[in-house]
Amino acid sequence: MGHIKREGVFIIKDLETLKVVADPVRNQIMEVLEKKPQNVKEVADKLGLAPSKLYYHFNMLEKVGLIQVVETRQVANLIEKYYQASSSFIDIDPTLLNFSTAE
């Protein structure tokens, strides 16, 4: 598991998750989703980006557990997913940043 949650804090425990969170667009997405659940189009409108440019980022964030689907709605013949940030705060496990020097 690449993360643990502690009292509203998402703790990153692996490099894959750290790389995902390091992306500026993904940071913006998480900031928007911290406030309330929204779908990809709503987030895209807030960020001034095309929804098609965000699907990859949403998938990466969901894959590592930084965001989650909290609601689905049927709109005509489409299903809209509403996402929310998993936690309000992110921290990095200090052991992930420990570098040993072998001699």
Report each predicted region and the residues it spans.
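Conserved segment of winged-helix/HTH DNA-binding domains
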Residues: L18, V64, Q74-E103
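Short helix-coil-helix linker/hinge
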Residues: K19-R26
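Short capping segments at the starts of secondary-structure elements
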Residues: P24, K35-E42
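Pre-recognition alpha-helix immediately N-terminal to the DNA-recognition helix
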Residues: N27-E31
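A short acidic, leucine-rich amphipathic alpha-helix
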Residues: E42-G48, L61
